[in-house]
């Protein structure tokens, strides 16, 4: 069984990740291992040495200073410590050839870590419908259409799924040096990026998997499992 490292952010007096991520890794045959966000340097490297894959979870906004921009008035709370830990963990995973799955913020962080940049606020950038369609602070499960590039990993993960859930006000503007956009919403927002051993999705498969097991495909890809996932994924 493969171990999957998940960076655990500070939450009050604890370090934690939402349980949905843990449950999805378990359902895909993996063993979730939490990596405290306070890990740095040699300790972080040692921790990544002991996992077989990396999961970058959703969360707050990435600090725009990471991609050379000033914060917009709509910026949510940032966590520089988490940004640093996850970027370094991602780069270590790249060096070791580990599979990496980024979800929402995690996909955005992958882009930033490889020289990309983000749309800081979709409505302010002219994606007016996204205020309602792409973000719902009540977590009521808003959905929108998504279309993947034929022959890509995103297409295989999305097979049979024409819609995904949505909870974000930021998105990838430029994917950086390694990642290629492979899925988009109807209004052109990047919904998936990928490269060898890398997959980033803008939606939240971990919250949808409890209702529709097809959303576990991204996690089966991460763990190398074969249940419901083509070998070529």
What are these regions (language model features)?
Residues 1-103, 112-119, 123-143, 147-155, ...:
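N-terminal beta1-alpha1 cap of cysteine-dependent amidohydrolase-like domains
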Residues 106:
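NAD(P)H cofactor-binding loop motif with strongest signal on the N-terminal glycine-rich segment
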Residues 157-159:
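Alpha/beta hydrolase fold serine-hydrolase catalytic domain that processes acyl esters and thioesters
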Residues 164-170, 193:
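Short catalytic/ligand-gating loop segments at beta-alpha or beta-beta junctions
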Residues 178, 195-198:
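Beta-strand-turn-beta hairpins that frame and shape the catalytic cleft
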Residues 189-195:
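Short, surface-exposed beta-strand/loop micro-motifs that present aromatic residues
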